[in-house]
């Protein structure tokens, strides 16, 4: 019987943070849960970051993932937006790290290429492929992106483990 691994995928954002938990058993993937965390937009930045941190911590306790994966920051035209996204990423990464989980980071283009086959895929294409790869899953764009990040990690962790076993 194949070892079962749970992966928490995180699509970071200060307004909407998508999350998804998948189970990997050999080459089989299945969705466990997914959703979106929405910090109060009127709250100060520190409170919104604490909301993200606490929410991810709750997800780790509730779903018991073995590993986590998050989308890397990308270069935005607006430096202030990029900095705030970096804060959100840090808050989201710290909770699983604090629980002792390894946290992998993947570029958005690699996630899209891993799930759709092209790094230039749009959100609708990612969501459609997530629905195919995880049958019965109907996720919003942010949650679908998080599930895609988890799927990307499942593929890359398997390739890494196969490479190290050779």
Curated annotation (Swiss-Prot):
InterPro entries: RNaseH-like_sf (IPR012337), RNaseH_sf (IPR036397), X-over_junc_endoDNase_RuvC (IPR002176). Its EC number is 3.1.21.10. It catalyses: Endonucleolytic cleavage at a junction such as a reciprocal single-stranded crossover between two homologous DNA duplexes (Holliday junction). The active site is at 11, 71, 142. It is found in: Cytoplasm. One of its GO terms (biological process) is DNA repair. One of its GO terms (molecular function) is magnesium ion binding. Binds 2 Mg(2+) ion per subunit. Its cofactor is Mg(2+). The keyword Cytoplasm applies. GO terms for cellular component: cytoplasm; Holliday junction resolvase complex. Mg(2+) 2 binds at residue 71. Keywords: Cytoplasm, DNA damage, DNA recombination, DNA repair, DNA-binding, Endonuclease, Hydrolase, Magnesium, Metal-binding, Nuclease. It holds the Pfam family RuvC. It is an enzyme of class 3 (hydrolase). The RuvA-RuvB-RuvC complex processes Holliday junction (HJ) DNA during genetic recombination and DNA repair. Endonuclease that resolves HJ intermediates. Cleaves cruciform DNA by making single-stranded nicks across the HJ at symmetrical positions within the homologous arms, yielding a 5'-phosphate and a 3'-hydroxyl group; requires a central core of homology in the junction. The consensus cleavage sequence is 5'-(A/T)TT(C/G)-3'. Cleavage occurs on the 3'-side of the TT dinucleotide at the point of strand exchange. Belongs to the RuvC family. This is Crossover junction endodeoxyribonuclease RuvC. It comes from Maricaulis maris (strain MCS10).
